[in-house]
């Protein structure tokens, strides 16, 4: 399974999600409501999403609420890795205010088009959506105060490069504050090789200790992982069936081993 193959599958799945945003009740990791509901429900309160365009909410593909985690302040510059339909970028733009800036980075043309449509409908000026990959962030060194991401880093085939790039663009003292899927315990190799499971935020998820080690190797300090939800295999029974995976065969191997988590880290002050 090559990195290119993984990227193509992910791009296609999330392009489909963008196109469906106006006609479905939502789509989470894996772009299938049967899988997404247990992962994505109750992430945002009504006050947060009430003023957002409906399509921004419907296209939400996350597993957490990094805008709440990040403790954004007025005047800060924030970057959302894998910004999708733009929900977290628009929420971040509110928090940093007119003196701040919120960037969204996505590799999928359909998602970028949807995000820019949502930005226009929301009437938010301090937002910019960039096309690119999270392994090669198109921003200069030391230019961002906070990096957020919502259930996207697990989709990358080169997470070490993602963390190095995040470290590079953060200012000294900058904060890494993401929601992601993390595993606890071994996931069988045949599951990790399944491209559709990768696009569904399962096969590519790092084990918690590996996530911590990779962040540290990139230079981050003050690393913490807080589990917010444990996912049971039964929640995804129908989705496994649809993609042709024998649920009864894999259920015991994955049950309770994937969790939604908040991951925090800091780029040291006085650093590069």
Please tell me what each predicted stretch does.
Residues 1-42:
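N-terminal auxiliary segments of SAM/dcSAM-dependent transferases
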Residues 58, 63-65, 73-136, 161:
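Class I SAM-dependent methyltransferase SAM/SAH-binding core
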Residues 78, 147-148:
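Hydrophobic beta-strand segment of the Class I
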Residues 15-20, 27-31, 214-272:
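C-terminal lobe and adjacent flexible extensions of AdoMet/dcAdoMet transferase-like proteins
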Residues 97, 160-175:
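A short glycine-rich, Lys/Arg-flanked "PGG" loop and its adjoining helix->strand segment in the class I
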Residues 182-202:
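Short, glycine-/aromatic-enriched active-site segment of Class I SAM-dependent methyltransferases
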Residues 154-155:
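A short His-aromatic
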Residues 92, 151, 166-167, 215:
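Class I S-adenosylmethionine-dependent transferase superfamily signal
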């Amino acid at each position: 399974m090559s990195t290119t193959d993984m990227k193509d599958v992910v791009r296609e799945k999330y392009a489909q999600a963008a196109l469906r945003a106006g006609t479905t009740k939502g789509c989470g990791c894996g772009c299938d409501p049967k899988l997404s509901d247990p992962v994505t429900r109750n992430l945002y309160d009504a006050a947060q999403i009430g003023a957002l365009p409906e399509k921004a909410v419907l296209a939400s593909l996350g597993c957490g609420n990094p805008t709440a985690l990040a403790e954004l302040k007025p005047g800060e510059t924030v970057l959302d890795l894998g910004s999708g339909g733009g929900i977290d970028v628009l929420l971040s733009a509110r928090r940093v205010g007119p003196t701040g800036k919120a960037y969204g980075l996505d590799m999928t043309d359909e998602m970028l088009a949807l995000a820019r449509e949502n930005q226009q409908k929301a009437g938010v000026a301090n937002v910019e959506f960039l096309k690119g990959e999270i392994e090669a962030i198109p921003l200069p060194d030391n230019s961002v105060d906070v990096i957020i991401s919502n259930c996207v880093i697990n989709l990358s085939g080169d997470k070490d490069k993602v963390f190095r790039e995040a470290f590079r663009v953060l200012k000294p003292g900058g904060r890494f504050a993401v929601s992601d899927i993390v595993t606890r315990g071994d996931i069988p190799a045949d599951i990790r090789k399944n491209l559709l499971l990768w696009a569904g935020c399962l096969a590519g998820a790092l084990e918690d200790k590996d996530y911590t080690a990779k962040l540290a190797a990139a230079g981050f300090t003050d690393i913490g992982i807080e589990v917010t939800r444990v996912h049971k295999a039964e929640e995804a029974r129908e989705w496994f069936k649809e993609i042709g995976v024998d649920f009864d065969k894999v259920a015991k191997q994955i049950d309770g081993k994937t969790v939604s988590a908040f991951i925090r880290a800091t780029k040291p002050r006085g650093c590069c």
